[in-house]
Amino acid sequence: GVTYRSVLKTTGEEFTNKNLNLKDNSIGMKSIPAATEEEVEATVKVMGGEDWKLWMQALKDADVLSEDASTVAYSYIGSELTYPIYFGGTIGAAKKHLHQTADEITKEVGVKALISVNKGLVTQASAAIPIVPLYMSVLYKVMKENNVHEGCIEQIERLFKEKRLLADTITDEHGWVRMDD
């Protein structure tokens, strides 16, 4: 088989912004180089919707899906501060593919496929992206002050309890289930 490796990089040009170094809590500047076309393609392979669609087709072919089955993939949009990485970068290309795949699954597999746009989360990978640790630390503080902060488990529990992933799912104008509300 082929091994693909995803990268969190911009497309087009290098991205430089302020960054919070979590090792020593210092603020400095950090840069990320632009991705090559091969890195963009590999990131779409890893983080796009191809595997999701293959799994859903396999479940349909095995006749193990109920008539009213639905499926959901998680996504993230974030602040304009992070757009060069998340929205316009390699992961943005993968997320666009994921969103297109949701439509394909709905039409071709016959299963309601949804995208849940979730709140920001600091991971080992995202902590290496300029501005993200600083942005997330401020975001978490504001969410806590406004009593809207929730952990990952609470967010997904709310997704299934409040957003109703059935026929009457609550979505925005793009058809996305917004958990970053």
What are these regions (language model features)?
Residues 1:
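Active-site loop/lid in soluble adenylation, ligation, and acyl-transfer enzymes
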Residues 47, 104, 108-116, 133-181:
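C-terminal helical subdomain
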Residues 4-110, 117-134:
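Catalytic loop of short-chain dehydrogenase/reductase
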